[in-house]
Amino acid sequence: MQEQYRPEEIESKVQLHWDEKRTFEVTEDESKEKYYCLSMLPYPSGRLHMGHVRNYTIGDVVARYQRMLGKNVLQPIGWDAFGLPAEGAAVKNNTAPAPWTYDNIAYMKNQLKTLGFGYDWSREIATCTPEYYRWEQKFFTELYKKGLVYKKTSAVNWCPNDQTVLANEQVIDGCCWRCDTKVERKEIPQWFIKITAYADELLRDLDKLDHWPDTVKTMQRNWIGRSEGVEITFDVKGYDNTLTVYTTRPDTFMGATYLAVAAGHPLAQKAAANNAELAAFIDECRNTKVAEAEMATMEKKGVDTGFKATHPLTGEEIPVWAANFVLMEYGTGAVMAVPGHDQRDYEFASKYGLTIKPVILAADGSEPDLSEQALTEKGVLFNSGEFDGLAFEAAFNAIADKLAEKGVGERKVNYRLRDWGVSRQRYWGAPIPMVTLEDGTVLPTPEDQLPVILPEDVVMDGITSPIKADPEWAKTTVNGMPALRETDTFDTFMESSWYYARYTCPQYQEGMLDSKAANYWLPVDIYIGGIEHAIMHLLYFRFFHKLMRDAGMVTSDEPAKKLLCQGMVLADAFYYVGENGERNWVSPVDAIVERDEKGRIVKAKDAAGHELVYTGMSKMSKSKNNGIDPQVMVERYGADTVRLFMMFASPADMTLEWQESGVEGANRFIKRVWKLVYEHTAKGPVAALNVDALSEDQKALRRDVHKTIAKVTDDVGRRQTFNTAIAAIMELMNKLAKAPQEGEQDRALLQEALQAVVRMLNPFTPHVCFTLWQELGGEGDIDNAPWPVADEQAMVENTTLVVVQVNGKVRGKITVAVDATEEQVRERAGQEHLVAKYLDGVTVCKVIYVPGKLLNLVVG
């Protein structure tokens, strides 16, 4: 064994061994308990960042630990390879998205291998290949035949710069999340999947997810947004149709003083024909933000349509306004307004001088003061005719019943969740497998024409999708008739909604999934990824699993038993102000810093001498130029050091602060383990451990070893507090380094301890542990070695600490045998000099003894 720890030599050698032996390739094995460990697949952006490294290190630690427990562990990896960034990069680099993507995959695959992740590379998937998306296309046509897919014209967020539709979540402050262009509203025909048909089950089954973070479950509950209420129909004078509204507060119905409709509502359109002010307002609303969070904060505006609706219970005429806070695609595109008891309605009514009628009493039973704001709490009704005096629940039921009796209302369950719009007007995505005949008939692409292959050899102009720009591409024939293919492509969330299932049978050619393999591996035992995916990806992921279950492909109801959301990686951020007042962000690697005695940064400059402003720790990002390249760190310290730091610096679900001093500390620790193994093995062969022959000191050390095994097993396995597991191993290493190594049993004990330490560290630092296991004469490869098991006998304490008091005051502590009698404890206490001086020349009148804990001597 060489004396110096040289990671660059060890790591490449061990990685080559794993590759040649195909160590992490697995197949179904009914005789073994399976464990499916999955990290969210990366987008091949070109380089791994520290967020990736953290995510995949956590996954690899879990997978390697479960493997050492003797389980059949599947840990696959792939590439979420479609998406808009590839189009931008292709235009910029004068290439096509496909070669750019495949080059990035090759580069990043190499980076993953350098970090020593134990993936089953035989199952690698790239979602942009026809071998993958063909099954998604086929499944979509089957969902269409089942009535779960439909096309409708819908208002979308349109980014005029990217020429594409944005999801509500991609609109930030009314602008495109990617290019910051002002977003417009546009009506276009789009394909939708009926996720609302599964809303109740998606909500209900959250209760089955005992090992998902509550924050994620709460976000999904709110996103699905189930509510119970009443749908009410209003007659409108001079308008051919009725208006329908939905309310969760029918108890306030007698206080409804106006209705509001969306600018795109047919009633508003009709009124605008001879109302120039309204027509201009409708035009302005075309650029209204559609994200709900934005809707809440924007200024509420409206125009009176001139139409009057009849209140179905009072018969009063109430005005109908067009308002910018009502959206056509939410509910019916019309709402009833109760300004006395809804703050938004109150602000709008106050602004435009509309009637505000209170119908709910304040908590103290008095009429509410509505001079400054609405009373939104539930309470007892007044000013409501026959319903006066009723509290919320009774009023809800009485008014709902009355409306139903009159044929103008019915109870309804509503959801905030909208159907999933899967059409994207971009090129680099899977083509949607639908065709339109010359007579306008829309059909799914026939199975013998699947997959609809996306041409990869294209020229990007950065504006129009190449498959939209080429009229020939869309032409096809169906049943002998000319037809045009759909030129929209799928939302990339489609690919990431089912990849986890395809990993179980990536080479399967007979269909989307091989049920036998899928049902052996699924559900995923642990899924690791960022909390930013809580409502989009993680909801579609659950939805797709239920679709596949209902198609008979899988038997489980949910895709993943446990979800671990890792925290973000933060780093120091610095900038200097340029000549034009702009901020120039400087990488923390290039910042020369001065610190105070507490280690806080007080001054910084860069190599060019610019005084730098330190903004503290923030998420690693391109915009602040504070990302640390994992590759540079691996080259400097080795993959094992980077991995160990990642797992030690912070609990997995908390933010991690990148500190190079911490990385150096992790590196020093690995060197200490190496040095101790080197010194130990250099002394030659080791005798067998004879537990019965150990001295008290040796037994105490062995007790520490086995207590550490027990703690680390619990921390890594049950609690998943990996940082405390590493801390416990470090503490044990300190004791082992100080332990005597002279006697035969000293060395035998150290051999047992080091073999345990190396196996416990193996999930974290697999390369160095692979090597040290061989040097310690471990059996076979460490990858197939069992996790160490704590010896219960070794952990039994044979001594205990007894506190000695004289007249109730603590005067000393003594170590005695666990089975010592009261006499022996008293005798031992008398020999303790700190205690003895208080007993000199006095009489002990009374002895209070709590066995194994406390001895109190009362003296006179």
Swiss-Prot record:
Q: Gene3D superfamilies this protein is in?
A: 2.20.28.290, 3.10.20.590, HUPs (3.40.50.620), Isoleucyl-tRNA Synthetase, Domain 1 (1.10.730.10), Valyl/Leucyl/Isoleucyl-tRNA synthetase, editing domain (3.90.740.10)
Q: Name one GO molecular function term.
A: ATP binding
- Motif 'KMSKS' region: which residue numbers? 619-623
GO terms for biological process, alphabetical: leucyl-tRNA aminoacylation
Q: InterPro entries, from UniProt?
A: aa-tRNA-synth_I_CS, aa-tRNA-synth_Ia, Leu-tRNA-ligase, Leu_tRNA-synth_edit, M/V/L/I-tRNA-synth_anticd-bd, Methionyl/Leucyl_tRNA_Synth, Rossmann-like_a/b/a_fold, tRNAsynth_Ia_anticodon-bd
Which E.C. number(s) belong to this protein?
6.1.1.4
One short Pfam family name for this protein? tRNA-synt_1g
Query: Main location per UniProt?
Result: cytoplasm
Can you say where in the cell this protein is located?
A: Cytoplasm
Q: Supply the alphabetized keyword list.
A: Aminoacyl-tRNA synthetase, ATP-binding, Cytoplasm, Ligase, Nucleotide-binding, Protein biosynthesis
Q: Which CDD domains match?
A: Anticodon_Ia_Leu_BEm, LeuRS_core
Catalytic activity reads: tRNA(Leu) + L-leucine + ATP = L-leucyl-tRNA(Leu) + AMP + diphosphate
Task: Provide the binding site for ATP.
Answer: 622
Q: Where is motif 'HIGH' region found? A: 42-52
The record's comment on protein family reads: Belongs to the class-I aminoacyl-tRNA synthetase family.
This protein is called Leucine--tRNA ligase
- Species this protein is from: Salmonella gallinarum (strain 287/91 / NCTC 13346)
Write the gene name. leuS
